[in-house]
Amino acid sequence: MAKISITLKKSLIGRKKDHIATVNALGLKKIGRTVEHEDTPQIRGMIKKVDYLLEVK
């Protein structure tokens, strides 16, 4: 399966608690950090929920 790179581009300060939890579940803690995940429907759903905070390649 393909890999996707996810980078946190915006701060989590003042965001909804469930959005913060979703970003943390993706493995992102600080702005500018990048992680790689398998391209699965579960990961895509998490990305869609907080897409305004992320950059996906």
Curated annotation (Swiss-Prot):
CDD domains: Ribosomal_L30. Pfam families: Ribosomal_L30 (PF00327). The keyword Ribonucleoprotein applies. Gene3D superfamilies: Ribosomal protein L30, ferredoxin-like fold domain. Keywords: Ribonucleoprotein, Ribosomal protein. It comes from the Bacteria. One of its GO terms (cellular component) is cytosolic large ribosomal subunit. Signal peptide: none annotated. One of its GO terms (molecular function) is structural constituent of ribosome. GO terms for biological process: translation. Part of the 50S ribosomal subunit. Belongs to the universal ribosomal protein uL30 family. This is Large ribosomal subunit protein uL30. It comes from Clostridium acetobutylicum (strain ATCC 824 / DSM 792 / JCM 1419 / IAM 19013 / LMG 5710 / NBRC 13948 / NRRL B-527 / VKM B-1787 / 2291 / W).
